[in-house]
């Protein structure tokens, strides 16, 4: 019986404490197992016994709507488009994580018993990474090349990740920021294992007219006026409310468009997993009650998927405090949407995108009421909402000009 089932026997008022310590104890046993088997596991390095044409195995939480899940889906899709031999394995249910729609062509964890040794790219952070690692059959994990694909959002990685790194032949990361964090954390003889492999998000090849028609169609489907100026942001409470920082988006929107300039402007806040931090839901609902231009969209219930969400928008505004990569930023920009975002440690391919507009920031100490980022000495950005509001207002003014005309540079 797993610790997630035992909780039913625990009195309700003690369950939060039970979960806190049960997870710590379980993770401690996993770390101990790594210590005990470390010599056996690392002895296989350089002895990858598989044919050079063996298919790459991409492992991840494919049915999860999270950024880590999307990273696995993007890699699998890119390899297929490049006509590489590749298999995909969804481990969402194997790890007891919430998931959604199963993807056609993706195997489940039972496939590990039949798959032959190969290059295995695992899109999971610790502690999920090592939990899955020991679910691999010994023959598979000891004769394969194991690559961890990690994402992290702070300059300092948790110290325990160093132990997990010993199980990997290589570590891939989506950005220079995550590479910087990993290099600081890892022992010197492991640093050479780190490679920056950005997510591949296809860029639209539609003309401006086709983009306009797509926007018009999306707005018609969901009841939005085609002449409205619509700003949007999408985030998950499970990705930490204070890091995603949607309140700053509200403030910047309201500064850009005061109440006497009410007509035809809307702010769509698309969120997921509100149950993770109910206090955050109350904060958003209070703001929406005071300003009916703010529309809250619960992604767990709404029929508006991410592609339609981007197509509805004039501007995607992310005033996050930190991002390991920022998949939604590049997805929006590559669909032809203007993106206003915090300029701190942007991934190069995002920073260089013609549709991305950076705003200024200052560094502050991490303050996370959800207690996810318990890393001593960590910092993140405090985005300048005045700068964001000015650039948002300028984009609005430009949207009213004849096509192709611009005001003064936004940078």
For each feature predicted by the language model, list its residue ranges.
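Extended catalytic core of nucleotide-activated donor transferases of GT-like folds
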Residues: 43-44, 57-59, 95-183
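Conserved donor-binding/catalytic core segment of Leloir-type glycosyltransferases
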Residues: 57-60, 225-244, 250-254
